[in-house]
């Protein structure tokens, strides 16, 4: 099993833990092989004082499936090459500082 996995093609299981307005989405990943420097180990939502663990802000807001509801889980890959050029409103909702661009898999 000496195959080196390309990290970019790894599939991860995410959970949409906060579906904020204007695509301010917070995603939780509890997989140890997910790049740990891309997530915040602990993050407290100052609007609700709720603490989350292992979360990031959704950067790739343009093609995130609308069908995914808060607390739904989904499979995804990290995709840092995509451009996120779409209109989105700018209302402030607290989100983690770290953001990741992803592609959701069906």
Go through the PLM ranges and name each one.
Residues 1-3:
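N-terminal Sec signal peptide cleavage junction
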Residues 6-35:
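Structural detector for short beta-strands of small beta-barrel domains
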Residues 17, 28-30, 59, 77-79, ...:
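A structural detector for beta-sheet-dominated domains
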Residues 26-51:
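OB-fold (S1/OB) nucleic-acid-binding surfaces
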Residues 28, 68, 92-95:
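Secreted/processed peptides and extracellular or luminal domains of membrane proteins
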Residues 56-76:
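Short nucleic-acid-contacting surface segments enriched for D/E, G, S/T with interspersed K/R
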Residues 79-85:
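Short, charged beta-turn/beta-strand-edge "cap" motif at the junction between a beta-strand
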Residues 91-106:
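C-terminal partner/receptor-binding element of secreted or periplasmic proteins
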């Amino acid at each position: 099993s000496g195959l080196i996995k390309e990290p970019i093609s790894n599939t991860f299981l995410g959970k949409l833990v906060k579906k904020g307005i204007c695509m301010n989405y917070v995603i939780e990943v509890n997989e140890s092989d997910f790049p740990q420097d891309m997530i915040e180990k602990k993050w407290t939502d100052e609007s609700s004082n709720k603490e989350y663990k292992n979360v990031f802000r959704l950067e790739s807001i343009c093609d995130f499936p609308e069908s995914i509801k808060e607390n739904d889980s989904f499979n995804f890959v990290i995709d840092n090459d995509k451009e996120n050029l779409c209109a989105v409103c700018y209302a402030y909702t607290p989100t983690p500082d770290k953001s990741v661009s992803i592609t959701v898999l069906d």
